[in-house]
């Protein structure tokens, strides 16, 4: 059996250690379904974090800007300034969209709570993600790539 070396680095978009091919991250973060790649990480075309953190810093800046916008949207939902267009009534195969104005009070209340918390949860997930990504970048940037034997 022939032993080969693989160079690995951390992806600037997801932070995970993956193979490096020709100076950029190899395709990763995907599944193959019926011969097609689905869910490929957008970091595949960037240099590893050890070499550059330009894309990582851009992601952190973009998400940081989105967080107050998401919280503001949640507040607008809470105060009634934003409402969903539709609510979903029923389950599974019997789902149907109903205009928000035609929904029952209980359905409206549930839809508003759900929408408000979807904005808040997304903001919280963004805060958590950028904290983790920044920690990985601080640890890995300007360090050596990893060589493994396969």
Question: Model-flagged regions — what are they?
Answer:
Residues 4-10, 24, 34-37:
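Short metal-coordination and nucleic-acid-contact micro-motifs, chiefly zinc-binding Cys/His arrays
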Residues 33-55:
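Short metal-binding segments enriched for Cys and/or His
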Residues 103-150:
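C-terminal, charged low-complexity interaction regions
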Residues 73-108, 129-132, 140-142:
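Extended alpha-helical coiled-coil "stalk/arm" regions
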Residues 17-35:
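Short recognition patches in nucleic-acid-associated and regulatory proteins
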């Amino acid at each position: 059996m022939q032993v080969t070396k693989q160079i690995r680095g951390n992806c600037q978009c997801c932070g995970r250690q993956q193979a490096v091919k020709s100076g950029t991250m190899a395709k990763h973060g995907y599944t193959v379904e019926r011969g097609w790649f689905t869910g490929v990480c957008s970091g595949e075309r960037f240099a590893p974090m050890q070499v550059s953190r330009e894309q990582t810093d851009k992601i952190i800046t973009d998400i940081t800007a989105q967080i107050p916008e998401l919280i503001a949207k949640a507040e607008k939902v809470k105060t009634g300034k934003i409402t969903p267009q539709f609510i979903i009534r029923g389950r599974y195969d019997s789902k149907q969209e109903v205009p928000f104005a035609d929904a029952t009070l209980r359905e409206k209340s549930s839809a508003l709570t759900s929408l408000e918390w979807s904005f808040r949860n997304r903001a919280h997930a963004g805060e958590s993600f950028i904290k983790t990504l920044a920690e990985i970048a601080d640890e890995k940037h300007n360090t050596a790539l990893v060589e493994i034997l396969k």
